[in-house]
Amino acid sequence: MNRFFISTLLLLAQHLAPAAASCGLANEASLSANEVQDIYHDFVATSINYADLLKRNEDLNASLSTGSPVEITSTSCTTDTSASTPIITESTSSTSSASTTGSSSSPLPSTSTSCTTSTSIPPTGGSSSLSTPITPTVPPTSTSSTSIPIPPTSTSSTDTNSNPLPTTSTSCTTSTSIPPTGGSSSLSTPITPTVPPTSTSSTSIPIPPTSTSSTDTNSSPLPTTSTSCTTSTSIPTGGSSSLSTPITPTVPPTSTSSTSIPIPPTSTSSTDTNSSPLPTTSTSCTTSTSIPPTGNSTTPVTPTVPPTSTSSTSTPPPPASTSSTGTSSSPLPSTSTSCTTSTSIPPTGNSTTPVTPTVPPTSTSSTSTPPPPASTSSTGTSSSPLLSTSTSCTTSTSIPPTGNSTTPVTPTVPPTSSSTPLTTTNCTTSTSVPYTSTPVTSTPLATTNCTTSTSVPYTSTPVTSTPLTTTNCTTSTSIPYTSTPVTSTPLTTTNCTTSTSVPYTSTPVTSSNYTISSSTPVTSTPVTTTNCTTSTSVLYTSTPVTSTPLATTNCTTSTSVPYTSTPVTSSNYTISSSTPVTSTPVTTTNCTTSTSVLYTSTPITSPNSTSSSSTQVSWNSTTPITGTSTSKVTSSTSIPLTSTNRTSTTFTSSTSISTSSSSTATSSTSFASESSSFYSNVTTSSSTVSTPPPTTSFPSTFTTSFITSSSLSSIPNNSTEVKTASTSSGTEIKTASTSSGSSSSSSYTPASSTSTTTSSVSSRQSSSSSSFTPSSAISTAKSSFVLSTLSILIALYMVA
């Protein structure tokens, strides 16, 4: 066969000589028998797997007559296994390593940003299962999701909470957040809201359920308070209260806001007490349900309200004429309102079943106002509680229990009452000042075509809330329980919402789209928004925390900080790391850029691309190689495989090809693994871009510029040398590099096909990267002739 091959080469050289002569190459282009034999031996010496090349280029002979231009893409990759905790940076293709001084025993929250509809169900600990996917119907345009679970570092803190605090969710459309704690979590029925294709935002911030030492603790969850856009009436009960006919005013379908203000149920002393609750007034457009149980109870407290009721102006008088200095160990009233449907039910302890109340899909509002159950003696009496009445979309009553009790406190009061109506004009601004031991000043909130309410929770020091000003929208500010005074500054938006979450973590992480704080105050960088709503949520902390708005354009940014130790799936790509990660912002048009930072010990899968490893993380970026006209370039897939050996390796390859026509394609997959004694097979795949045949005839092929290059590598087992032979433009090039085990990348592109193959083999303890980039298109007839001859020789050998 060798004789036949050499004879064929000589015959081809003789037949091609006249064509070369027509190009002025009569004396230069022919190949002697020795030259042909040298070329053959060089290819054989490099251990070329011709069968594999033939399989990937079955159309080589047919495409040789087209003379189509080919763009060559070379991929360079560096693998580093020197440490097990890398830091991710964005580059064309890079991985790096870094060590961290912190340890982690439980996960911290994750942040999710979304442009259309975002559904976040972050279970904690153990395993998580979801039998039916949550599939909201959204348009096929701009969506993004950012999931940022932080390493589960065990750190000590002066402000802790043994149970999760309530979650605050703000939405323009629909958002569902059900973060259970401990054990395993399951959700048998999907929550599938249908939303319009416009901006939505959601903020879900559960707090770590870990027990740590603290100077300010709370053994049961606090009530949540949220505010929004129309008006509702709150009826505090001693006994039971019911409302047979809902008051349903007509409100515009725009602007919503939500403010969540948990109140501590701690025992405090006061000089002003009342054994029955004061009424609260809230406003709402639709439904918000918040039932925070206490202690390790797995059953939510669900007060039973009779199906019949009286109007919204009825109010119970105090059950007794008593007053005195005393303490109250039950939670204070909470007022919640919202603008579409938002359900947030954070159970506590090791509960494995989420609390899922059934709520109608249309506007309702709930106001819960439990009285303090403490018996107090008094220096004065009150004949009946104060009452404020306003308009409402629908009214419901919830009563948070106290301590570890699963039964709500329900004092019995006489059925007499009095009421004083409130007058509203197309909008209502309400201020609710709960029970406190020191004076609390609440400033009204000014809105336009909407209602904003401010709720000041129970605190040991005065808390002042400044007004919020909005235009055709509502902006909310939430001030949580804190040991020092916290002042919330106004948020101003224009017909849109942007949310910022400042969670609780041990190491700060900063990016253009989100900010995660440490145990010390963290300030997030403001981002200007258009056509959205802005919401700021400040979590439980020992020192004041200031958060400034984030900004997007024609989109809504949502930040979700869940708590998870299991893999998270991202729609675009996922990156894992055990140390803080900084991502470089990506600018898009009519789209949203998503960044995922995930801590996990198992591989992660996602539709587009995924990178996950217990010791290495790779960040992929593609640079398109363009021809005369580029249509579009997409990106890569990276699958790190880890063996049982101590050292695991990762490899990331990225190829992108654009032809001179308007077609594009990108695809590259690379697998790398190792065992204790030998290398596994290297599996490569190629991407092919089909181009329309040119209008030129076959003889003109010799004057058409195109490239044929091959880069071939062989790595013997435990070898210390990698031999790479490359042939480009008819010139033989040999390069060799040595290392103690190495990684190499090879690419092969035949004369008239458009495929790029990348492969990588990583050895133990070290890695290196080699890349081969062939020269650009040949412009002279001589080089083109030599390339054509060489391509035909290779093809004939493979066929033979």
UniProtKB/Swiss-Prot annotation:
Main location: secreted
GO cellular component: cell surface; extracellular region
Protein name: Uncharacterized protein PB18E9.04c
Record keywords: Secreted, Signal
Signal peptide segment: 1-21
Location of the region described as Disordered in the Swiss-Prot/TrEMBL record: 63-470, 602-670, 710-776
Compositional bias segments (type: Low complexity): 73-314, 321-368, 375-444, 451-470, 710-720, 735-776
UniProt subcellular location: Secreted; Cell surface
